[in-house]
A protein has these predicted regions:
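N-terminal secretory/targeting leader peptides
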Residues: 2, 6-109, 127, 132-312
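Hinge/lid segment of periplasmic solute-binding proteins
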Residues: 112-130
Length: 312
């Protein structure tokens, strides 16, 4: 340990002081509250001996939807941004290959697929946005949440979604919705609860724990537990910012961000089931073990026919 500390001190002393302008994901979701925000605001300054810091804010605080995030990064408005790959795929369809709706049904396989696709994403981020991709991570499984009006409904096949207005945020999810006869409606995550209240949408697609944290249980009755992906997400730096950093600062990020990425995947694995439990009848606890209210949604498991439809 002493040798490590001795070796690391010169690197810190050689660092140039820098404050980064950073955008995280949504303020009310746990990736920001427990990992993204703390990394930039607490861990980075500590690891760098105060040399590196960040003015880091969530999409929610900045009033951003997430769809525009890479354009702002390219313009140099921000130094680094966290985002969802399918939110930015309208500008670069190849990016969506990391998260095709319904193709992969388990998180382990999904992570391997994203890692395999990483080199393609790295190239696309650099060529399209002048950005350096430094992290890939996921969210709990993307499932359907619907206001069916009657909680006595205990079964609901995908064929019954015909004519329903369903919130989406990507082309691939929109294709799935159209494929089952629904009508895809693109709505930013932060605006979905009022959209469901007003009938602009009948159902929405999002992750299990994000749905709970965003209080979707206040406006929907059912959780249709068909997995349509895990919302592949990223951290990217503006390439000019990255290249302007001294080698000691770059080395710190390249050493520490893989650790943060691993924490993201571990949390996602835990939060998938936790979200389903919290949205339904429990048990429901936060990450520290404190009791939380349950959402009271009726869970509906996919039928064999529904599972087969995903493979078509």
């Amino acid at each position: 340990m002493g040798g490590f500390a001795f070796a690391s001190q010169p690197a810190i002393s050689d660092m140039q002081k820098k404050e980064f302008k950073v955008v995280g994901t949504w303020s009310f979701l746990d990736h920001w509250k427990e990992r993204e925000g703390p990394f930039w605001k607490e861990r980075l300054p500590k690891l760098s001996g105060g040399k590196l810091s960040a003015n880091a804010k969530s999409l929610t605080e900045l009033g951003l939807s997430g769809f525009e995030i890479m354009r702002l990064l390219k313009l140099g408005v921000y130094d680094a941004v966290h985002g969802v790959t399918t939110y930015i795929a309208q500008d670069s369809p190849v990016i969506e290959g990391a998260d095709l709706a319904g193709v992969i049904q388990d998180l382990g396989t999904y992570r391997k697929a994203n890692e395999t696709y990483r080199s393609i994403l790295e190239r696309e981020f650099e060529e399209k946005y002048g950005a350096k991709l430094l992290m890939i991570y996921g969210w709990p499984s993307q499932q359907l949440f619907c206001n069916l009006g009657n909680k006595n409904i205990k079964t609901y096949g995908l064929d019954k979604l015909k004519g329903k207005k369903i919130r989406t945020y990507s082309t691939t999810l929109g294709d799935f919705i159209e494929g089952v006869g629904g009508s895809a409606v693109t709505i930013a995550f932060a605006k979905l609860v009022p959209a469901l209240q007003k009938g602009v949408a009948d159902c929405g697609l999002t992750g299990t724990l994000p749905a709970y944290n965003a209080k979707w249980w206040q406006v929907v009755t059912h959780n249709i537990r068909i997995r349509l992906g895990y919302a592949s997400s990223f951290l990217a730096f503006n390439m000019k910012t990255w290249k302007s950093l001294d080698k000691e600062s770059q080395a710190l990020f390249q050493r520490e961000l893989p650790k943060l990425e691993e924490e993201m995947w571990v949390a996602t694995a835990k939060n998938d089931q936790r979200g389903m439990d919290c949205n339904a009848s429990g048990p429901c606890k936060d990450s520290k073990g404190n009791d939380l209210p349950t959402g009271g949604m009726v869970p509906i498991e996919p039928t064999d026919a529904d599972k087969a439809k995903l493979k078509e």
